[in-house]
C-alpha cells in the first residue's frame, strides 16, 4: 500500500504543472457544459482517479474530491481543487458522486460506513451516484438498493429518488489520461442517458449493459477474456520460440491469421517485439498482476454464485496466484509470458 501511494504521488507531482496551467485554465475560461449536472464529487484519487478528475475539470465541471491519502488530498488542494475530509462532506457539495476504489469492501464502506455517502439517508443531495470500481455484481446490487431506499434533499426534474450506476472502465492509465476510457454501465437506462455527458468527458465509449450490476458483470467477463487471451498468446509465443520461430515472426503470423487478438497485436507480452507496451520496459506500468488475480477471484465468486462451470477461470487463477507468490504482483499481467518461457529475449 505504501508503494502504491508513493507511485501515485510521483505521478501526481509530474502531472501537477500541466494540471494547473492546462486544466484549471480551461475550466476558468471555458463556457459551462450543457449537462444538467455541474457539481461532481470524486472519491478515490489513485492512478486512474486523479486522471479522470483532470478530464472532468477540462470539461468544465466543478469537482470536489476525497481520498484517504492526505498527501494526495493536499496536492489537489494546492492545485485549486476543492477537497473534503469525508465522503459525506463530498456528497453535501455534489449533485453527482463518482467513486473509483480498489475493492468491494472499500466501496461498501464509502457508501454505507461512518461518514459515508448515504449518511442521513432521508436527506441526500446527490441525485446520481456512479461507481467505476471493479467489484462483484452482488455488492453493486446491494449498494444500489441502499441508494434507492434514500430520499433526495431536493427533487430534481423527474428524479424522485437517488440512483446508482455501476460504470467500471477499460483502457487503463493511458486511456484515463487521454480521456478515451470505455465505460460498461449498469442501472436504470434514463439515469445512464443523464450520465452520458459526464462519462463522455472521461471516456470515448460508453455501453449500456442493462440493469444494476450488469456493468460490473461485463467488466469481470471482459477481464476474464483478457486474462485467458493473454495466457493463450503467451503460451503460443513461448512454444514458437522453443520450436525455433522468432517471436516477431510468429507475431506477424498471428496478426495476419485467425490467432490475432488484442494480446498479440496491441499488448504483445514478449520483450523486444513491440514498443510502448509493458513488456518493452521490464513489465513495469500497465495492469498489475495482483489486480488481474483480484478480478479473476471476482469472476470465480460470481460463477460460483450462479452455478456456472468455470474451468478456465480456475486455471487462470492458479497461474496468476503463482505469479504473485513468485514476486511479480506489481508487474504488468503480461509478465505471465515468463511462466511459459525463460529463454533469450528478442531485443
UniProtKB/Swiss-Prot annotation:
It is an enzyme of class 1 (oxidoreductase). One of its GO terms (cellular component) is mitochondrion. Residues 1-34 form a transit peptide. GO terms for molecular function: 3-hydroxyisobutyrate dehydrogenase activity; NAD binding; NADP binding. InterPro entries: 3-OH-isobutyrate_DH-rel_CS (IPR002204), 6-PGluconate_DH-like_C_sf (IPR008927), 6PGD_dom2 (IPR013328), 6PGDH_NADP-bd (IPR006115), HIBADH (IPR011548), HIBADH-like_NADP-bd (IPR029154), HIBADH-related (IPR015815), NAD(P)-bd_dom_sf (IPR036291). Transmembrane segments: none annotated. It catalyses: 3-hydroxy-2-methylpropanoate + NAD(+) = 2-methyl-3-oxopropanoate + NADH + H(+). The active site is at 219. It is found in: Mitochondrion. GO terms for biological process: L-leucine metabolic process; valine catabolic process; valine metabolic process. Its EC number is 1.1.1.31. Pathway: Amino-acid degradation; L-valine degradation. The keyword NAD applies. Belongs to the HIBADH-related family. 3-hydroxyisobutyrate dehydrogenase subfamily. PANTHER family: 3-HYDROXYISOBUTYRATE DEHYDROGENASE, MITOCHONDRIAL (PTHR22981:SF7), 3-HYDROXYISOBUTYRATE DEHYDROGENASE-RELATED (PTHR22981). This is Probable 3-hydroxyisobutyrate dehydrogenase, mitochondrial.
Amino acid at each position: 500500500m505504501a508503494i502504491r501511494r508513493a507511485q501515485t504521488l510521483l505521478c501526481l507531482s509530474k502531472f501537477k504543472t500541466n494540471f494547473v496551467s492546462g486544466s484549471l485554465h480551461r475550466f476558468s475560461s471555458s463556457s459551462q457544459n450543457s449537462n444538467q449536472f455541474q457539481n461532481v464529487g470524486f472519491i478515490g484519487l489513485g492512478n486512474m482517479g486523479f486522471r479522470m478528475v483532470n478530464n472532468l475539470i477540462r470539461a468544465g465541471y466543478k469537482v470536489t474530491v476525497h481520498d484517504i491519502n492526505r498527501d494526495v488530498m493536499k496536492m489537489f488542494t494546492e492545485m485549486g481543487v476543492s477537497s473534503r475530509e469525508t465522503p459525506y462532506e463530498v456528497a453535501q457539495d455534489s449533485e453527482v458522486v463518482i467513486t473509483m476504489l480498489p475493492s468491494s469492501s472499500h466501496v461498501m464502506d464509502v457508501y454505507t460506513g461512518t461518514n459515508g455517502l448515504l449518511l442521513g439517508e432521508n436527506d441526500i443531495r446527490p441525485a446520481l451516484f456512479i461507481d467505476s470500481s471493479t467489484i462483484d455484481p452482488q455488492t453493486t446490487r446491494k449498494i444500489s438498493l441502499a441508494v434507492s431506499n434514500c430520499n433526495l434533499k431536493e427533487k430534481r426534474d423527474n428524479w424522485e429518488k437517488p440512483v446508482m450506476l455501476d460504470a467500471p472502465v477499460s483502457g487503463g492509465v493511458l486511456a484515463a489520461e487521454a480521456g478515451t476510457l470505455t465505460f460498461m454501465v449498469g442501472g436504470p437506462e434514463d439515469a445512464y442517458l443523464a450520465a452520458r455527458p459526464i462519462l463522455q468527458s472521461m471516456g470515448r465509449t460508453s455501453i449500456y449493459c442493462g440493469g444494476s450490476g450488469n456493468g460490473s458483470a461485463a467488466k469481470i467477463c471482459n477481464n476474464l477474456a483478457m486474462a485467458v487471451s493473454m495466457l493463450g498468446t503467451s503460451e503460443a509465443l513461448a512454444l514458437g520460440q522453443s520450436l525455433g520461430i522468432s517471436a516477431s515472426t510468429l507475431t506477424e503470423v498471428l496478426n495476419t491469421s485467425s490467432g490475432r487478438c488484442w494480446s498479440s497485436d496491441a499488448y504483445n507480452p514478449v520483450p523486444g517485439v513491440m514498443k510502448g507496451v509493458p513488456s518493452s520496459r521490464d513489465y513495469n506500468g500497465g495492469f498489475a498482476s495482483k489486480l488481474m488475480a483480484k478480478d479473476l477471484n471476482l469472476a470465480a465468486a460470481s460463477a460460483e454464485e450462479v452455478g456456472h462451470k468455470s474451468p478456465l477461470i480456475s486455471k487462470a487463477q492458479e497461474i496468476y496466484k503463482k505469479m504473485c507468490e513468485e514476486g511479480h504482483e506489481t508487474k504488468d499481467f503480461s509478465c505471465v509470458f515468463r511462466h511459459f518461457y525463460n529463454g533469450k529475449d528478442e531485443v
